[in-house]
């Protein structure tokens, strides 16, 4: 199962997930010169991937940064996912799909097959749990996985997710129902191919959330630029075995801190990953 592969990568490499949220603004002009958007976005991503792949569990590609540039951007998105697959690296397509019925079926096909194939995708359950229906057959095949939004890292998460529902925050109602579904898709590592997105910026109830869902892998955004603290993140990881911690700008823009950064983008991305690992693992 793909969750077993991810679990193994965490144990062998680290809990770090590199976010390839690659804005065109992040790419130095010297790389852009004379190239199409599809070419320079992929070139930038490849530099990051090549210099960090042995240190990290996986890579998360946020589709919005590519969709914004039409066909050219989506070519870069496709090529990035293909490069990850060709190098036996685990990919998460951050697409946050949240529709139902035949539309969800087409979304599942779009992101688990063909040009945009990824190992995991992110899913939004706001419309109801039938949003998951057409992704589950891909989990049954043991080759794909999903991370479903449970409690997110953005400040506005409290507008809805923290609302009282039967005496507890609404996010527990979401998590409890997802947990029932997730138990049908356990790997040998005793974790499910249905994971949760749990923001690291909110330390409230961290221990309770981790204990309540022992068979769930957490995708944890918020580290770095968003300010999640390592001591809070460690709780969600459960001895560094049940979570991956995403950092995007903190890694891919680290080169901007150095005078020779534009000539050494990959080198400084690697340094950011090394520093992140030391920070979280207390090395």
UniProtKB/Swiss-Prot annotation:
<keyword id="KW-0665">Pyrimidine biosynthesis</keyword>
<dbReference type="GO" id="GO:0004590">
    <property type="term" value="F:orotidine-5'-phosphate decarboxylase activity"/>
</dbReference>
<dbReference type="GO" id="GO:0006207">
    <property type="term" value="P:'de novo' pyrimidine nucleobase biosynthetic process"/>
</dbReference>
<protein>
    <recommendedName>
        <fullName>Orotidine 5'-phosphate decarboxylase</fullName>
        <ecNumber>4.1.1.23</ecNumber>
    </recommendedName>
</protein>
<dbReference type="InterPro" id="IPR001754">
    <property type="entry name" value="OMPdeCOase_dom"/>
</dbReference>
<keyword id="KW-0210">Decarboxylase</keyword>
<dbReference type="GO" id="GO:0044205">
    <property type="term" value="P:'de novo' UMP biosynthetic process"/>
</dbReference>
<dbReference type="InterPro" id="IPR011995">
    <property type="entry name" value="OMPdecase_type-2"/>
</dbReference>
<keyword id="KW-0456">Lyase</keyword>
<feature type="active site" description="Proton donor">
    <location>
        <position position="96"/>
    </location>
</feature>
<dbReference type="Pfam" id="PF00215">
    <property type="entry name" value="OMPdecase"/>
</dbReference>
<comment type="pathway">
    <text>Pyrimidine metabolism; UMP biosynthesis via de novo pathway; UMP from orotate: step 2/2.</text>
</comment>
<comment type="similarity">
    <text>Belongs to the OMP decarboxylase family. Type 2 subfamily.</text>
</comment>
<dbReference type="InterPro" id="IPR013785">
    <property type="entry name" value="Aldolase_TIM"/>
</dbReference>
<dbReference type="InterPro" id="IPR011060">
    <property type="entry name" value="RibuloseP-bd_barrel"/>
</dbReference>
